């Protein structure tokens, strides 16, 4: 117990003596933590109860308070004991107040029976700084020698769920979901289903914000679970064994919650965007990063899908039509079916070298596909290089094994394994030197989940934690230094934030789009000034039904590089309208680099006036003219307006200015 008190005091020493602008007191049977922005009320009784969370003029908790259990921990003992403990399995000891110069903290303690020795405390700490807009939540637990915490479910906070409330998750660009009376929404970070460490619930009365302030990028899952008229916000973490030191466990970051009567966009920009500038990945803008120059100028991408005469002829036509500077993301260049025989890409298909050279002479820049995460255990290399020792292992010693449409088993490799690091470096070197490409596209790194790994030979602590993104960080940095020349580019699939500064460009195509969801520009709001990204969603095989034109319009407005279309599909005679619109927008985008190379996306706009709607199959019903506000590198605020229809339209912008936009065209005007 003495050790626990000392640790709390050490944690709080960084703040100094209490300021009058933040108060923590015990009054009328309650603990009250309050500053000018926030007021939290907890019961001071025999049972823990979070009674009120007042912010921006509203109490966001249910009438009876947040009655869900505030934490749940899974322990692992030296004999294999594996209990799941929560408050009801312990003795609640009440709360106490710790005051310092710049902050106050409420500490709530439960004593838990772990073994025959003394009981072991679990504490939650709720801290509010004198000027803070968001209270910070932490958890710590003490335990006997030889024990660790393997899973944490904290915090768990139930808020009132108004009728019609919707959830915003950082899935792809950002996705809005309907919240039902039961079930849950979930976002796994870092991956395409959790590109950032926040989730939001919004309704006509305002927005609830829930986020982790983790500068390391550890794996975690955010959940929003419906319980009647309440919504429980939950953070699940598979822990690192390194987080248990000297018989004490703590999660090495704060979790925060807030409320604003403004919209979800305001909440994300006000609270999450500032945090990202404090991270390794978000500290530098595009103009401050060493990005390949051709990537900056690649306003459009093609996606050749084969190595044959028909594909090359389509590439020639497309390059002639769209001009120099186009990026080409080339698939199926190796002699095996897709998602098989990784990482054995060589020898390449006959004629690929010649196609690369010709395309480059036409002004194109090529990044061929490889996978940066999977190893097929049926390959010769897996056997000869002892691939099983590079594979990521579950706690029970088995391998993470994934199966895709190829129906072939693929094992997930651990990025900390030097076997796999050497393999990935070797493949990159061979592509760059033998094929002489302009870079390499490494699939899945920015998209697929980081997995907890319990292998004992990889040099990291067992479990989860930030070692996974840091392992990729050190590997990619080494490759950049030793293998890549100045104008050669690394690209990847999707936009998990912890890898932003490691890649020249990130392909964003995994956002869900159907009648149950709505794509929203959450990622551009936060990172449009620090990340170059391309794509919108996967390109459907039928592009003449309005879907490609809609995707091209949205891509431009959200700051994405355009296209990523199979050239033989794009250059068909029946796709002339789509090809022309894409060319118009590509030519337009080439003139807007003061926005897209260090400027910032501000908001999406639906102009009023003559602006009919069109149903886009498998997407949404959209106005045919959409717009966006951007801030340029110099600080100028402008509107971009795009008309995807074949008729001109006269529309009205938020500044009341009326503007006529020609058919299949885009314009820029100052705000």
Curated annotation (Swiss-Prot):
<protein>
    <recommendedName>
        <fullName>Putative glycoside hydrolase BT_3595</fullName>
        <ecNumber>3.2.1.-</ecNumber>
    </recommendedName>
</protein>
<dbReference type="InterPro" id="IPR046226">
    <property type="entry name" value="DUF6259"/>
</dbReference>
<feature type="signal peptide">
    <location>
        <begin position="1"/>
        <end position="24"/>
    </location>
</feature>
<keyword id="KW-0732">Signal</keyword>
<dbReference type="Pfam" id="PF19773">
    <property type="entry name" value="DUF6259"/>
</dbReference>
<comment type="similarity">
    <text>Belongs to the glycoside hydrolase-like 3 (GHL3) family.</text>
</comment>
<keyword id="KW-0378">Hydrolase</keyword>
<dbReference type="GO" id="GO:0016798">
    <property type="term" value="F:hydrolase activity, acting on glycosyl bonds"/>
</dbReference>
<keyword id="KW-0326">Glycosidase</keyword>
């Amino acid at each position: 117990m003495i050790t626990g008190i000392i640790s709390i005091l050490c944690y709080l020493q960084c703040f100094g003596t209490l300021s009058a602008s933040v108060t923590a007191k015990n009054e009328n049977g309650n603990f009250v933590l309050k500053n000018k922005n926030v007021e939290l009320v907890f019961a001071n009784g025999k049972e823990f109860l979070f009674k009120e969370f007042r912010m921006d003029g509203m109490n966001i908790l249910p009438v009876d308070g947040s009655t869900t259990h505030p934490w749940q921990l899974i322990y692992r003992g030296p004999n294999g004991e594996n209990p799941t403990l929560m408050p009801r399995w312990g003795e609640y000891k009440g709360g106490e107040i710790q005051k310092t110069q710049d902050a106050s903290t409420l500490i709530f303690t439960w004593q838990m029976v772990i073994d025959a020795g003394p009981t072991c405390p679990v504490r939650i700490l709720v801290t509010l700084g004198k000027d803070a807009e968001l209270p910070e939540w932490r958890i710590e637990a003490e335990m006997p020698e030889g024990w660790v915490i393997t899973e944490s479910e904290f915090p768990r906070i139930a808020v009132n769920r108004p009728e019609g409330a919707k959830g915003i998750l950082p899935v792809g660009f950002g996705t809005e979901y309907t919240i039902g009376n039961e079930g849950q929404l979930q976002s796994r970070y870092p991956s395409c289903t959790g590109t950032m460490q926040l989730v939001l619930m919004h309704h006509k009365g305002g927005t609830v914000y829930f986020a982790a302030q983790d500068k390391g990028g550890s794996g975690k899952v955010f959940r929003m679970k419906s319980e009647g008229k309440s919504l429980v916000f939950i953070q699940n973490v598979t822990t690192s064994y390194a987080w248990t030191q000297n018989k004490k466990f703590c999660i090495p970051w704060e979790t925060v919650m807030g409320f604003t009567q403004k919209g979800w966009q305001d909440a994300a920009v006000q609270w999450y965007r500032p945090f990202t500038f404090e991270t390794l990945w978000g500290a530098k803008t595009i103009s401050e990063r060493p990005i390949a120059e051709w990537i900056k100028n690649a306003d459009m991408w093609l996606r050749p899908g084969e190595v044959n005469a028909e594909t090359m002829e389509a590439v020639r036509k497309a390059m002639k039509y769209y001009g120099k500077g186009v990026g080409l993301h080339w698939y199926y260049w190796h002699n095996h079916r897709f998602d098989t025989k990784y990482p054995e890409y060589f020898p390449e298909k006959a004629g690929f070298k010649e196609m690369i050279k010709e395309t480059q002479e036409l002004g194109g820049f090529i990044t061929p596909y490889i996978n940066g995460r999977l190893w097929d255990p049926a390959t010769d290399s897996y056997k000869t290089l002892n691939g099983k020792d590079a594979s990521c292992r579950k706690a029970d010693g088995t391998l993470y094994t994934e199966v895709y449409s190829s129906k072939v088993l693929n094992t997930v490799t651990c990025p900390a394994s030097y076997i796999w690091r050497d393999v990935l470096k070797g493949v990159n070197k061979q592509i760059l030197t033998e094929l002489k490409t302009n870079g390499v596209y490494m699939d899945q790194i920015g998209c697929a989940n980081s997995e907890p790994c319990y292998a004992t030979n990889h040099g990291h602590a067992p479990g989860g934690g930030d070692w996974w993104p840091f392992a990729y960080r050190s590997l990619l940095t080494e490759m950049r230094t030793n293998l890549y020349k100045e104008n050669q580019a690394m690209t990847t699939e999707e936009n998990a934030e912890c890898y932003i500064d490691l890649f020249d460009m990130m392909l964003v195509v995994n956002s869900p789009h159907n009648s149950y969801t709505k794509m929203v520009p959450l990622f551009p709001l936060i990172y449009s000034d620090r990340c170059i990204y391309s794509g919108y969603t996967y390109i459907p095989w039928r592009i003449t039904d309005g879907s490609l034109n809609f995707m091209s319009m949205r891509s431009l407005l959200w700051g994405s590089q355009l296209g990523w279309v199979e050239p033989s599909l794009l250059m068909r005679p029946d796709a002339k309208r789509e090809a022309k619109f894409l060319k118009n927008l590509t030519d337009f985008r080439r003139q807007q680099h003061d926005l897209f190379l260090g400027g910032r996306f501000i908001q999406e706009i639906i102009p009023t006036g003559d602006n009919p709607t069109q149903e886009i199959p498998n997407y949404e019903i959209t106005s045919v003219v959409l717009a966006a506000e951007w801030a340029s590198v110099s600080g100028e605020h402008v509107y971009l307006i795009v008309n995807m229809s074949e008729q001109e339209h006269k529309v009205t912008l938020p500044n009341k200015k009326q503007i006529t936009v020609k058919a299949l065209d885009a314009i820029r005007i100052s705000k």
